[in-house]
């Protein structure tokens, strides 16, 4: 199975190319040397990542053609919207009607939605978000792979199971050879077109080593590489970009500077924000968001989190529930509920309808095994599958009982594709 559909180059203007998919045209940034009009390519996240032979492309397209339009039909049916709901308050209906029509909501309106408790109103909120997702992004759903390369961390976050203060963690650091082999398998054998490398803030790798790993992956296999190594330093972001990294996953964790300090052992939020701003200026695709349910977090904070992610030019929003880890200072605090998580996802979709890719996080699936389906029907359109070697997965113990921890990548792919097909989604990155 492949997570991208080949597109045909229709026009080239310097580094910008127009790619055509079954009649739809998208723009992408090209970094390949030998591209001509008429060539077939894979594009991800707005970047051309690989040229493919015409016969190969045409055979993949002929398989996709019917399925592609059939899936769109199913998605369209599932995202129909009916705003005639008697059990929903007039105020809520007014706000949701404005949202569905694409009119900008005031802060007060969004707060009303975030405080809403009525089940029918919430169902309608999720439907509006799903309607907007379909309207702007059609049925595409990104399926990215993640490799967790090390669980060493010099940070001391009060929520995180792999923080430096947790002495009960068995630490691991994958060697360059292991990382390259895991990347090869993910790209070559399992078809991932975008791969995220993640670790704690681990000074055990020099920045040159990390850059070399990115360089080697780029030199050997066609994929878009995202990194998530924490705060690597502003200059090092540039080094990693030059090596070939094109996406940065860095959550700001909370938009509330006081809460951030409490949650991170005294760190300053401004440093994370500076990384995110610099990364955007360098050309990275930004994946960011926050932890929902941190002790002391208010509903206003949640709203500010969504606005901050937007302000930071999130290409993809990543909001996950805080889950209490027994060996951390935040142990015993309750997790955010699925309902709160779905509200945040739906509101992110409403606030940034046309642009946002919204991730269903593993943490959300951990608190609710059906959450992937529920979130995809509440505005989300992106999933990340765990391609870390099985032997290391239990050691990347951010919180207990992580979803999919014991599932092989083959099983994750099969289940994901099954779910996406049942919802009429195509596992593609078309909405570039
Ligand atoms: N070191 C990198 C960083 O700082 O962004 C990436 C690794 S960090 C462990 C990845 C994410 O895990 C964090 O951004 C945080 O939101 C999430 N996380 C850590 N502990 C968690 C917990 N107890 N519950 C839910 N998510 C958690």
Please report, for each region that a protein language model flagged, where it lies by residue.
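N-terminal pre-triad scaffold of radical SAM enzymes
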Residues: 126-165, 171-198
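A residue-level detector for short acidic-glycine micro-motifs
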Residues: 8-13, 32-34
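Structural motif
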Residues: 39-40
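Auxiliary Fe-S-binding modules of radical SAM enzymes
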Residues: 4-5, 16-27, 35-36, 61, ...
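Core AdoMet radical
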Residues: 164-180, 186-208, 213-276, 285-292, ...
């Amino acid at each position: 199975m492949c997570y991208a559909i080949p597109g045909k180059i229709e026009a080239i203007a310097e580094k910008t190319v127009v790619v055509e998919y079954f009649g739809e045209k998208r723009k992408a940034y090209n970094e390949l040397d030998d591209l001509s009009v008429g060539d077939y390519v894979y594009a991800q996240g707005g970047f051309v990542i690989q040229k493919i032979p015409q016969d190969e492309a045409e055979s993949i397209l002929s398989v996709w053609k019917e399925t592609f339009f059939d899936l769109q039909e199913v998605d369209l049916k599932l995202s129909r919207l009916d705003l005639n709901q008697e059990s929903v308050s007039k105020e809520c209906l007014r706000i949701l009607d404005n949202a569905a029509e694409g009119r900008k909501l005031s802060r007060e309106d969004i707060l009303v939605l975030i405080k809403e408790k009525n089940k029918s109103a919430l169902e309608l909120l999720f439907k509006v978000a799903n309607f907007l997702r379909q309207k702007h992004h059609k049925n595409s759903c990104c399926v990215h792979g993640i490799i967790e390369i090390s669980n060493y961390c010099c940070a001391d976050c009060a929520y995180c199971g792999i923080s430096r203060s947790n002495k009960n963690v068995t630490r691991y650091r994958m060697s360059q050879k292991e990382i390259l082999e895991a990347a090869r398998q993910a790209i070559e054998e399992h078809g991932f077109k975008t791969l995220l490398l993640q670790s704690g803030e681990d000074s055990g790798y020099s920045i040159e080593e990390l850059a070399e790993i990115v360089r080697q992956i780029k030199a050997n296999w066609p994929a878009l590489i995202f990194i998530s190594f924490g705060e690597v330093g502003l200059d090092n972001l540039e080094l990693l970009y030059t090596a070939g990294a094109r996406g940065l996953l860095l959550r700001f964790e909370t938009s509330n500077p006081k809460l951030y300090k409490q949650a991170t052992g005294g760190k300053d939020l401004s440093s994370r924000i500076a990384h995110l701003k610099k990364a955007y200026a360098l050309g990275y695709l930004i994946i960011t968001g926050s932890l929902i349910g941190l002790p002391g977090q208010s509903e206003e904070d949640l709203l500010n989190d969504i606005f901050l992610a937007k302000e930071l030019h999130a290409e993809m929003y990543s909001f996950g529930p805080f889950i209490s880890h027994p060996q951390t200072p935040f142990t015993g605090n309750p997790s955010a509920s699925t309902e709160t998580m779905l509200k945040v996802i739906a509101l992110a979709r409403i606030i940034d309808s046309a642009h946002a890719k919204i991730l269903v996080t593993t943490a959300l699936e951990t608190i609710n095994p059906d959450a992937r389906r529920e979130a995809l029907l509440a505005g989300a359109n992106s999933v990340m599958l765990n391609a870390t070697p099985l032997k290391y997965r239990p050691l990347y113990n951010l919180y207990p009982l992580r979803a999919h921890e014991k599932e092989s990548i083959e099983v994750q792919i099969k289940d994901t594709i099954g779910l996406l097909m049942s919802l009429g989604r195509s596992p593609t990155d078309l909405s570039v």
